Amino acid sequence: MKKVFITTGTEHYLRQLMANYTGGNVTLLQNFSQSLLYQESTGEKLFQEGAEYRVLQSSGSIKGFGVVVFEYIHLRDEEIPIFLQMYQRASLHFSETPGLQSTKLTKAMNMNKFLIISFWDSEVFFHDWKKSPLSKEITNIMRKNNTQSGFSHEDIYHYPEFSHDAK
């Protein structure tokens, strides 16, 4: 089973962790307020702290540049089938979405917290997608079904990482 592991910390600390794990598939992602390490693996996580998600669906391939968007969605048990059906329907159009490199639908290992991870050529393409009819339809359906999507949030990170920390 493929998993995604995420841990956060200062850039300096995360770079030290990366230096210790030369063989691992670990990527440093950053925005202007936060840094995180992202690992995809069928094995064990390389760091002790952080979140663990099971990959439910994956499409596309990562080019090695751009932005990564993390969309966190908390759902009640009865909302999960509706959400999964909407995601499945939307995923049929991902290959046609300009600037979209890859998507991953993941679920936290011990709660009804989903994380949609999408890799984009640039932040502009992501914002264009959010304005698209399909994205708006999904948002409206979630609101109509009284989901907790209003409590969800998204974070945008750049890759490859940039360096603030000369240490």
UniProtKB/Swiss-Prot annotation:
Q: Which InterPro entries match?
A: ABM_dom, Dimeric_a/b-barrel
What residue stretches are annotated with the ABM domain? 67-154
Keyword field: Cytoplasm, Heme, Iron, Metal-binding, Monooxygenase, Oxidoreductase
Q: Give the intrachain disulfide bonds.
A: none
- Altering W129R: what's the impact? No effect in heme-binding activity. 64.6% reduction of heme-degrading activity compared to wild-type
How the protein is affected by changing Y53A? No effect in heme-degrading activity
Which GO cellular component terms are attached? Answer: cytoplasm
**Superkingdom to which the source organism belongs:** Bacteria
**Subcellular locations according to the entry:** Cytoplasm
- This entry's Enzyme Commission designation comes to 1.14.-.-
Provide a Gene Ontology MF annotation, just one.
metal ion binding
Its top-level enzyme class, in one word, is oxidoreductase
**Where does the UniProt entry say this protein principally localizes?**
cytoplasm
Q: Where is this site: Transition state stabilizer?
A: W129
Question: What residue spans carry the region label Important for catalysis?
Answer: 1-50
Q: How does it assemble?
A: Monomer.
What does this protein's UniProt record list under function?
Catalyzes the degradation of heme to biliverdin in the presence of a suitable electron donor such as ascorbate, with the subsequent release of iron. Hardly any CO is released by the heme degradation reaction. Binds heme. Allows bacterial pathogens to use the host heme as an iron source. Release of iron from heme may play a crucial role in the pathogenicity of L.monocytogenes.
Q: Which family does it belong to?
A: Belongs to the antibiotic biosynthesis monooxygenase family.
> Mind telling me what this protein is named?
Heme-degrading monooxygenase
